[in-house]
C-alpha cells in the first residue's frame, strides 16, 4: 500500500524533533575557541568546504538545517545574512543554541517552518543555498517540490549544494535483512529513512532547472567507502 505523504512527514518531524532535542541538552563537546572548531561541526571536509564557500555570498539559505552547522560555517566565513530553517522544532532549538555559542546571532536567523514555506519566499532571494541530508530522507513529492522552488528563489549566479546519502540497491538491502518499499524507500520502525536513487537519477531530477557543476563522493567519519554524494549546482540560464 502506498504511504501517505502527510503521514510520512509528520512521523519524520516527530523523529527529528526528538533527535535534535536531545542534542540541545548536551553541547559540552563544542568548544568555539578550539582550532578548527567549526570545521569539526561539518560531517565531512567536502561539506565544510561547500558551506565555507558560501561565506562570500550576500544571502544564504540553509534548508533543513538541523543544528545549523552549514549556516554557522557560512557566517563564520563572511556571509552576513544567513537563514537557517527546519520543520522540526528540536532542530531549531539546537541550531539557536549553537549559533549563540559561536556568537553569530546577528548573522544567522534560525526559525521553524511548515512544509510549504518555500512557496512564500520571493523570487531570486538567495545567491547561495545548502541542503544536506534532506532530499533523500523525505517523501519524493516533497523533494521534487524543494528542487523546483529552489530554482525559483535563487539568483542567476547562485551556488547550490545538495548533500545526499549513499545509493542502496534492493539487492544490497536484502543482503542486510532490509526491504525497500515501492522499490526505493527504506522504512525503519515506521520512519522513512531513505529514498534511494542513483547519481544519474538525481542528476535527472535536477536537470530541468540546474546544471551539475561538480559531483563529489565522500564518507562520514568511520565509513570506509566514499559513497555519499555532494552535488554542486548552478541555475540554468533561459534559452
Can you describe what each PLM-predicted range is?
Residues 54-55, 123, 147:
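A short, aliphatic-rich alpha-helical micro-motif
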Residues 144-156:
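A short glycine-rich, Lys/Arg-flanked "PGG" loop and its adjoining helix->strand segment in the class I
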Residues 63:
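Conserved beta-strand/loop positions that form the S-adenosyl-L-methionine
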Residues 131-134:
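A short beta-strand submotif of the Rossmann-like class I SAM-dependent methyltransferase core
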Residues 120-129:
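A short acidic, Gly/Pro-enriched loop at the edge of an enzyme's catalytic core
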Residues 1-56, 66-118, 138, 142, ...:
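Class I (Rossmann-like) S-adenosyl-L-methionine-dependent methyltransferase catalytic domain
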